Curated annotation (Swiss-Prot):
<feature type="binding site">
    <location>
        <position position="109"/>
    </location>
    <ligand>
        <name>5-phospho-alpha-D-ribose 1-diphosphate</name>
    </ligand>
</feature>
<dbReference type="GO" id="GO:0006207">
    <property type="term" value="P:'de novo' pyrimidine nucleobase biosynthetic process"/>
</dbReference>
<feature type="binding site" description="in other chain">
    <location>
        <begin position="135"/>
        <end position="143"/>
    </location>
    <ligand>
        <name>5-phospho-alpha-D-ribose 1-diphosphate</name>
    </ligand>
</feature>
<feature type="binding site">
    <location>
        <position position="115"/>
    </location>
    <ligand>
        <name>5-phospho-alpha-D-ribose 1-diphosphate</name>
    </ligand>
</feature>
<comment type="function">
    <text>Catalyzes the transfer of a ribosyl phosphate group from 5-phosphoribose 1-diphosphate to orotate, leading to the formation of orotidine monophosphate (OMP).</text>
</comment>
<feature type="binding site" description="in other chain">
    <location>
        <begin position="79"/>
        <end position="80"/>
    </location>
    <ligand>
        <name>5-phospho-alpha-D-ribose 1-diphosphate</name>
    </ligand>
</feature>
<feature type="binding site">
    <location>
        <position position="113"/>
    </location>
    <ligand>
        <name>5-phospho-alpha-D-ribose 1-diphosphate</name>
    </ligand>
</feature>
<dbReference type="GO" id="GO:0046132">
    <property type="term" value="P:pyrimidine ribonucleoside biosynthetic process"/>
</dbReference>
<dbReference type="InterPro" id="IPR023031">
    <property type="entry name" value="OPRT"/>
</dbReference>
<feature type="binding site">
    <location>
        <begin position="37"/>
        <end position="38"/>
    </location>
    <ligand>
        <name>orotate</name>
    </ligand>
</feature>
<dbReference type="InterPro" id="IPR000836">
    <property type="entry name" value="PRibTrfase_dom"/>
</dbReference>
<dbReference type="Pfam" id="PF00156">
    <property type="entry name" value="Pribosyltran"/>
</dbReference>
<dbReference type="GO" id="GO:0005737">
    <property type="term" value="C:cytoplasm"/>
</dbReference>
<dbReference type="InterPro" id="IPR029057">
    <property type="entry name" value="PRTase-like"/>
</dbReference>
<comment type="subunit">
    <text>Homodimer.</text>
</comment>
<keyword id="KW-0665">Pyrimidine biosynthesis</keyword>
<feature type="binding site">
    <location>
        <position position="139"/>
    </location>
    <ligand>
        <name>orotate</name>
    </ligand>
</feature>
Length: 233
């Protein structure tokens, strides 16, 4: 329930409602038509960016306290992950300067640069480093697999992923029959790579929080979507 969330998650949920959460009909990469869309690219206002970066930083700190999560570099996959990585690194240093005061960040280019410093990576070198990926959501998992492959190619070790939203959504069935139960992309990446994934909010949180401003029809459509596509993990 949104009312039971920690203050930083409540602030993030309010920011999401104010700036990035939209209801309507949105085609996803999976070709499903979602009744809601969460676009972290819309966190371009200073107050909204502060709310999301604080939420990421608090989530990271809680993950360290709960699981011992340890990392050297915060990595943001281009493009939406870039401001998330830089602002989260800054907020980590602000909240716990003794531990995170010298933490580095890095991000990738969509296309390798063949002049100047060259390469695919901007920011801290990844070789021999423990890397934490921060991004907005995991829907199909394709972008996260690409990011993991790039980090490994550079000699880094991915030790975890933090996302803003867990859609709690199962992967599309190989035979196109979405009536079958199935795992989420988030769960499959956890299993495939053996790394922990942490989320600030879940779809359940979004639905509960949206009841204060969304129409009854939007809430109903989102709840029906959740029931139809909810993952088994």
């Amino acid at each position: 329930m949104a009312s039971q969330l920690p203050p930083y998650k409540q602030d993030f949920l309010k920011a999401a409602i104010a700036g990035v959460l939209k209801f309507g009909s949105f085609e996803l990469k999976s070709k499903r038509i979602s009744p809601y869309f969460f676009n972290a690219g819309d966190f371009y206002r200073a107050d909204l960016l502060r709310a999301i970066s604080l939420a990421y930083a608090h989530t990271v700190i809680e993950a360290r306290e709960a699981t011992g999560l340890d990392f050297d570099v915060v990595f943001g996959p281009a493009y939406k992950g870039i401001p998330l990585a830089t602002s989260t690194t800054d907020k980590l240093a602000e909240l716990d300067p003794a531990r995170y005061g010298t933490t580095c960040y890095s991000f990738d280019r969509k296309e390798a640069k063949d002049h100047g410093e060259g390469g695919n990576i901007v920011g801290a070198p990844l070789k021999g480093q423990k890397v934490l990926i921060v991004d907005d959501v995991i829907t199909a998992g394709t972008a996260k697999r690409e990011a993991i492959a790039k980090i490994r190619k550079e000699g880094g070790e991915v030790v975890g992923i933090v996302v803003a939203l867990d859609r709690m959504e199962k992967l599309p069935a190989a035979d196109g029959d979405d009536s079958k139960p199935g795992p989420s992309a988030l769960g499959e990446i956890k299993k495939e790579y053996g790394i922990p994934i942490f989320s600030i909010l879940t779809l359940d949180d979004i639905i509960e929080g949206a009841k204060s401003f969304a129409s009854a029809e939007d809430i109903k459509r989102t709840e029906e979507y959740r029931a139809k596509y909810k993952a088994t993990d």
